[in-house]
């Protein structure tokens, strides 16, 4: 039992809920490899740090000798998961789903052991359900129970439409657990309802219900909302080391500890020691550097992490410009705000104006207050914020 307690404590780290812990203990007592499932709909080509919170937990199960299944929702991705949405998510085409799925496989192996990871596609069984199977599946749940779900309840209360296929989605995800005979399913806190549907469907099928483990959603770079590509507050696992380093260094000191708890593999005692040192006067920047290097070493290598640190020091602490930066050439007159947008330094001309008003736009190191004028002729280095540079020639 002591060993089980040790394993349980390790598995509980960073989790939000385990439903139920007693069931997990019973499964661990069986002393067999558990089937642990994590599903993801390939709705976008990139995996970001927010996704890795649950991937890290899957890796932990893998290291403990359990069977891990990374389920790619090539079928459910065409339906669209309504979790956490205040409007109907537009379904993707099969071509989009399959293209994104290919990049997923490459990226998850930055975290999971490819030799011990079973990748499955839920179209293998969901596409065979047919009309009769779908009706039988739908008979397991009532509309009233579906409306207990927070996002559906809010939309219903606000007279916002809920499409029938959105009610079907949790049932399809739950059926994945029946098809795989999963012992454990992982997901973010926004997936709790779907994970519990899996438990119910397994019971209806005469199987032992899976343990549902939810993990917190990682707050993005803005320090307010969950990390999301659509919000632009994310760090992709395939981003260049220098970009990853700069973005990690940009987060607030308060958010840093949340990231340490959810992303770092350091022992909790070591994280607590770092926090104590900061409280006693250690510069939080130095602790943030440790986190940035740990993440870059994980997704690239230690050499890249050290190089990114040195570049960061040269660029920001010594005021140096990077040796390499994107280069652009424009012919004829072009507005400065338009140039910044076309060079990828800002998402819009309005953002260029806002950045300039805040003192964040520079040409050759000199601040520019008005970006409504035309850009100067010749070759110049344009900078927005601390990390974005471009060498631009206006002919």
From Swiss-Prot:
**Recorded superkingdom:** Bacteria
Q: Which gene is transcribed and translated to give this protein?
A: tyrS
Q: Taxonomy-wise, where does this protein's organism fall, top ranks first?
A: Bacteria, Pseudomonadati, Pseudomonadota, Gammaproteobacteria, Pasteurellales
Enzyme Commission number, as recorded: 6.1.1.1
Q: Where is this motif: 'KMSKS' region?
A: 226-230
User: Assembly state and interactors?
Assistant: Homodimer.
Q: Where in the cell is it found?
A: Cytoplasm
Which one of the record's GO molecular function terms can you name?
Answer: tyrosine-tRNA ligase activity
Name of the protein: Tyrosine--tRNA ligase
**Family, similarity comment:** Belongs to the class-I aminoacyl-tRNA synthetase family. TyrS type 2 subfamily.
